[in-house]
């Protein structure tokens, strides 16, 4: 029984190698603006200089402030 499972596992790995699974590096970035060189959250209109974070949602400005 174990040898049959081994043969089945070998066949499955040959047909569908682990390299065919997409890795995290292949996924698009959630926030492409963070990848640019000129991204400065301090210049955002929602940036709170006292708390050093943005008062808006994280999809709008990074780093976003923790909820109160």
From Swiss-Prot:
UniProt protein name: Conotoxin VnMMSK-01
Highest taxon in the source lineage: Eukaryota
InterPro entries: Conotoxin
Entry keyword set: Cleavage on pair of basic residues, Disulfide bond, Hydroxylation, Neurotoxin, Secreted, Signal, Toxin
Cystine pairs: 53-65, 54-61, 58-64
Molecular function GO terms recorded: ion channel inhibitor activity; toxin activity
Sequence similarity: Belongs to the conotoxin M superfamily.
Signal peptide residues on this chain, from the entry's feature table: 1-20
Domain notes per entry: The cysteine framework is III (CC-C-C-CC). Classified in the M-2 branch, since 2 residues stand between the fourth and the fifth cysteine residues.
A single Gene Ontology CC term: extracellular region
Modified residues (4-hydroxyproline): 63
Residues of the propeptide: 21-50
């Amino acid at each position: 029984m174990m040898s049959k499972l081994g043969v089945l596992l070998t066949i499955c790995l040959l047909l569908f190698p682990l390299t065919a699974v997409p890795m995290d590096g292949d996924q698009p970035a959630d926030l492409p603006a963070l990848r640019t060189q000129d991204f400065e959250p301090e210049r955002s209109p929602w940036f709170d200089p006292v708390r050093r974070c943005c008062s808006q949602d994280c999809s709008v400005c990074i780093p976003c402030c923790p909820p109160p």
